[in-house]
Structures are given as C-alpha cells and as structure tokens.
Amino acid sequence: MLIIPAIDLKDGACVRLRQGRMEDSTVFSDDPVAMAAKWVDGGCRRLHLVDLNGAFEGQPVNGDVVTAIARRYPNLPIQIGGGIRSLETIEHYVKAGVSYVIIGTKAVKEPEFVAEACRAFPGKVIVGLDAKDGFVATDGWAEVSSVQVIDLAKRFEADGVSAIVYTDIAKDGMMQGCNIPFTAALAAATRIPVIASGGIHNLGDIQALLNAKAPGIIGAITGRAIYEGTLDVAEAQALCDREQR
C-alpha cells in the first residue's frame, strides 16, 4: 500500500480544505513545487495533486503548477484531479508528464466519457468517487447525486480504469480516521484497485487500514495529517512495507 501525499492547489498555493468547503481553507505553502520536494525527499512514491479551482470551474486553473511539479520529477508517478472534463485536458496533462488523471464529476454525469478516455489514454485514467452517506457527490462536492458509489464503481470495471480514489466527504480534512468499513466494502465489490482518501490522522489509521486485510486497497492519500505533523510519510510507508511483505 502506498502512502500518497496530497497537494491541493488553490490560487497557486498549497492549501487544505475541511469537508471540501472552499471557504474553509488553510494555506500551508505558497510554493507547491517546494512542498512536492519535501514529500519526495521524505520518501513518497506517488503524489496526489488536486486543482481545487479547476474542480469548481470545470477546467484547469492551476495547470502550470502541476506541469512544473511533473517536469521536476519525471520518474515519480503523479496523479491529478480537478476540472478534468475533456480529452484535450487529459492529453495536456499526459504530455506534461503526469502519470494519471482523475475523472470525478464527469464520470458521474457522463460515465461513457470514462470508457472513451480509457480507450484514448490506456492505463492513465483513475476515477474519483467522492461520497456522502454512500452517494456520489459532484462539482467540487457542491452537489450530492442519487447514484450509489459501489453501483457506479462496478460500471467502470470493463473500461480499463487504473484505480478508484474513494473519498468520504464527511471525513475529509477532519483527521478523525477514514471510513474503513466502506472503503474495504468497495474494494471487495469491484475488481478495480481502490485508493482510500479522507480523514487519516495518524499511524493508527494506517494500521487500521492494513488490518482491514483488503488486498484491493492499494494506497492511502493523506493531506492535513502530514501538513500538521500528526503523520510522518516515511514512517507510514515503512509500516506499510513491513506489513505487506
């Protein structure tokens, strides 16, 4: 299981939100490239970037920052989400050196777009499913749909999706532990690898994820915990490596 540091981009800065609210953000750095360097130096093996402005506007806004990070670390897998709603945007990021693009809102509203993207960019597409009470949320979490997470995840199995990033909105940024039962249930219900996101606070939460013994969970995204110092990236990754030998 990979420990994946999150770099959320808002107006060119590295921030963290609470429960997806743009008005409730904390700026952790005005130099996201330097922040990426910190996590890489700390031993991370993948980075999770989110263009928060892009998620709300429906098109890339902080793309220059994403490109700068990807070019600085050409051998590091980087995944980017937020505002990815066209093949042109995916092509732009892939050409910039990004390993994976995360399709969120568009995957819910137009599931057929995921299949199209997977055909055009095989191995590059991740679906981001953000949920509240088991139902998928869209548009930067501003809207909650009537679509259930597990039902939608199963729909993408035949498309060639590389992974699903599952985020429980109620947990995100709150550092109260992630929704392990549902994350494990999702991993068990689909053949697509799952990356857990939202709520990780400390090493105990990583251990709890490992204890779930869900082989389909391949990663855990962490944000506020590593910025506020309650979780150390290297220590957490070492725990995962030991447990999964």
From Swiss-Prot:
NCBIfam families: 1-(5-phosphoribosyl)-5-[(5-phosphoribosylamino)methylideneamino]imidazole-4-carboxamide isomerase (TIGR00007). This is 1-(5-phosphoribosyl)-5-[(5-phosphoribosylamino)methylideneamino] imidazole-4-carboxamide isomerase. Belongs to the HisA/HisF family. Pathway: Amino-acid biosynthesis; L-histidine biosynthesis; L-histidine from 5-phospho-alpha-D-ribose 1-diphosphate: step 4/9. The gene is hisA. It catalyses: 1-(5-phospho-beta-D-ribosyl)-5-[(5-phospho-beta-D-ribosylamino)methylideneamino]imidazole-4-carboxamide = 5-[(5-phospho-1-deoxy-D-ribulos-1-ylimino)methylamino]-1-(5-phospho-beta-D-ribosyl)imidazole-4-carboxamide. It is found in: Cytoplasm. Gene3D superfamilies: Aldolase class I (3.20.20.70). CDD domains: HisA. The active site is at 8 (proton acceptor), 130 (proton donor). It comes from the Bacteria. GO terms for cellular component: cytoplasm. GO terms for biological process: L-histidine biosynthetic process; L-tryptophan biosynthetic process. GO terms for molecular function: 1-(5-phosphoribosyl)-5-[(5-phosphoribosylamino)methylideneamino]imidazole-4-carboxamide isomerase activity. It comes from Pseudomonas savastanoi pv. phaseolicola (strain 1448A / Race 6) (Pseudomonas syringae pv. phaseolicola (strain 1448A / Race 6)). Its EC number is 5.3.1.16. Disulfide bonds: none annotated. Keywords: Amino-acid biosynthesis, Cytoplasm, Histidine biosynthesis, Isomerase.
